[in-house]
Amino acid sequence: MKTFIVGGTGFLGYYTCLELLRHGHKVSTLAHMPPPDELDFPQEVKLDIADMNKISDEDLLAHLQAADGLIFAAGVDDRVVPKAPAYPFFYAGNVSATERVMRLAKQAGVKRAVIFSSYFVACHQMWPELKLSESHPYIKSRVEQIEAAKR
């Protein structure tokens, strides 16, 4: 299977690359940052360094058209503390980015997709009475990200 990873040089993306290669997949990735020097990034992975939010739909579509599967291992996480109000920042980085990639993946004929989100989504689903998505804009964006991916 040919798999395209958005965010393949981050922690989850990097280890996903390794695991996919181990299972015989062909892997390509679009990453915002080059891999850290201390990582032995696999030469078999086609690596393109670019900000997915700044490249054109046509360029992103070209990556997706070469893939059977997509893994979205990008977005902004809760370690980032944006200026108030925080929700628009998290929405743009998680929900809008996912909507765009999934729309283009569908257009490209990608057969399968996996979204790496957050353990907060699992907590939100397990304990809805806590209303976690109402208490933090990051959690809200990750819950909405999953819904956006399903559309």
Briefly describe each language-model feature range:
Residues 96-141:
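Conserved Rossmann-fold NAD(P)-dependent oxidoreductase catalytic core, especially the SDR/UDP-sugar
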Residues 3-23:
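N-terminal Rossmann NAD(P)H-binding glycine-rich loop of SDR-like oxidoreductase domains
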Residues 45-46, 50-95, 122-129:
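NAD(P)H-binding glycine-rich loop region in Rossmannoid oxidoreductase-like domains
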Residues 25-32:
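Conserved glycine-rich Rossmann-like NAD(P)H-binding loop of the short-chain dehydrogenase/reductase
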Residues 151:
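Conserved beta-loop-beta element that borders a ligand/cofactor-binding pocket
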Residues 6, 30, 73-74, 113-119:
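SDR active-site strand-loop-helix element
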Residues 36-43:
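Short loop/helix-cap segments at secondary-structure boundaries that form the rim of catalytic
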Residues 146-147:
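A glycine-rich helix N-cap at a beta->alpha junction
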